[in-house]
Amino acid sequence: MGYRSFIVQVDDNDQSDRRVTLAAILARLHEAELEGVYVTPAREITPFTSAILPDSVVANRLRDTGEAQARAEQRFRACAAAAHLAAVSWSAPAGPALDAAVLHARRADIVVTGQPLPEDAHAGFAGDLLYGMLMRAGRPLLVVPHFGDFSEVGQNVLIAWKETRESARAVSDALPLLKRAGKVVVMPVSSPGDSDSGGAGSGAGVTAWLARHGIKASVRAEVADEIDVGNLLLSRASDLATDLIVMGAYSRARLAERVVGGVTRLILESMTVPVLMSH
């Protein structure tokens, strides 16, 4: 089964235009619908801030927020039109940003979003939104780097494989993209001293499963010794001219919440090619 609906997170900046263009191209390729979703940054007006701020400040912020939303919609529709995509819709839900984004994400097959810009005024908000969606949406996220041209994605795919639920979910979620790929490499990564050091056998099961779906994949096992797993994956992705990484998104407990794990966070912060992640 292919993708029938895409959602793309839209902002009022050039980085958003690039990911909207990619989302529109993919939606057209898969004959799917595309919905643009704009959520208001957390520092904008809330019931609490509107109660304590002067009326003039509230009015100015509401005006600025409305103008930014209108510009974002205009940019979204222009990018979708340039990609000759007809099945397009727009949403700017009210309420808490993460809750709204998660609810909309669950209505789609896949969500296209962006790597937060470190220097952006809303970088903290964007990071929290991205990590929260990964943990809560129950949908794969295709995360697009903030720099680079990614009008074509999925011709040369690297699967970062572990024998885990998250990895299995990610590979299954990526099937429509993998079926169109020209090259797929499964990369199990182990640590020195593991009983299956090098992971030579750990990729056999998933490659056999992929073969049953008509996808030919090779296995390239790696051992992370003098380099951590995240940097190893990024290095190999560069070596192999990868244009898409597929991997599970991992979490760890911190008090009463779940936060993304170290490898997941490193990839999201340092990625140079789009990454499809599932939790």
Regions found by a protein language model. Give the residues of each.
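Gly/Ser-rich helix-loop-strand patches that form or flank binding pockets
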Residues: 20, 25-29, 100-150, 236-279
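Structural beta-alpha unit
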Residues: 1, 41, 78-111, 212-245, ...
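Amphipathic coiled-coil/heptad-repeat helices and related helical stalk/stem segments
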Residues: 19, 97, 126, 167-170, ...
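Small/aliphatic-rich secondary-structure junction motif
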Residues: 1-56, 136, 149, 153-222, ...
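A structural preference for short, hydrophobic beta-strand core positions in alpha/beta folds
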Residues: 36, 89-92, 143, 186, ...
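A short acidic, glycine-rich active-site loop
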Residues: 56-71
